[in-house]
Amino acid sequence: MQTLNALYQSPPKNVKFINRKFEITAPKTLIKGGIGSGKTSLIAGFLSAFESKEFLCINLGDLRIDADEILSNLPEFLRQNPQIKILAIDDFEQRFQDKFEPVLELNLSNFIVASRFKDANLSGFSELNLDFLDYEEFIAFFSKKIDPETLFSHFLLHGRSPASAFCDAENVAVNLQTALKSSLPVTQLAVLKECAKAQAQNVSVFEIFSTLKSARKISKDRVYSALSELENMSAVSLVEKFNEPNAAKRLYFNDFAFKSALSLKKDFAKNFNNTVFCELAKFNEQIFYTKEFDFFLPKRKLAIICSPFSDADLVFLKFKKLHANLKNLGINRLQAISVANSGETSIEGIKCEVAPFSRWALGI
């Protein structure tokens, strides 16, 4: 009870908060989002509309508390403090569900639960799948007087975490490392570091296993499991090859800034591809890759190639060569995403657009 009282007396401090495209609206809300996606700040923003005596906020991942003991004592503490109308639980894991059930029987106006796991589930809760910042949200953190080229450079340097948007560029990698170390077991972190070598490329679990087994005792099954767990935590996404489900999957980070936090090796082209993927992922639609196209979204009849520095004429030449492939796939639009170039053409009803990322990301 003393620990719960200490938490109650120390509510979350006000944080610099800018409205997201997501908001808490349901009385019972389960927020699911990756490490650094802004779950905590979304909760803090919601709670800021209430007096501190009206809510209790608990981070079950806090090293200073015993989560099981906290959940066991929580129903009685809330009964003793009827002025508490809102309960916010951060860093929830499914293993806590049984001890959390008695809490849900209490008559509170709001239950807000946040988890980094996509498979988290609570009966009767509305689910809010919180993505990292997209480009439009990111630039809202900055003055409108800043030119688009500078904003795009900031985006590439800072990544998609709301916390990263506020810190100096040189501190982004260190802050992300701290967040990853505090959230991931050693094996998952080791696998994630190896994933940095496969950014925007076909990932080989065998290669990751071969590298790791020389330094630690690990099985191939454990590597598969760790990679699956990282995907479940929205740390990475694995993209299938179209019509070839057994082919190697292509790996992307859900926050492209993870690459610079995990590796000193720079590869602008691959990081640019990853940045484009992150903008597409917000649609929550099936995304594929093909031999010719970086991304293919069948539902939108859209194919995308990433050409950061190719001028429009070169892209149009490639478009002519790819026209038959586009037609066979039923694609009516090819977009070539660039750093600064632009242009447009069409052949037999299929449109080809060359667009700078900063304009494209605000228009999709």
Where are the predicted features?
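A cross-kingdom feature that marks ATP-driven nucleic-acid transaction machinery
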Residues: 34-36, 41, 242, 249-364
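Short glycine-rich substrate-engagement loop in P-loop NTPases that contacts/grips substrate
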Residues: 53-82
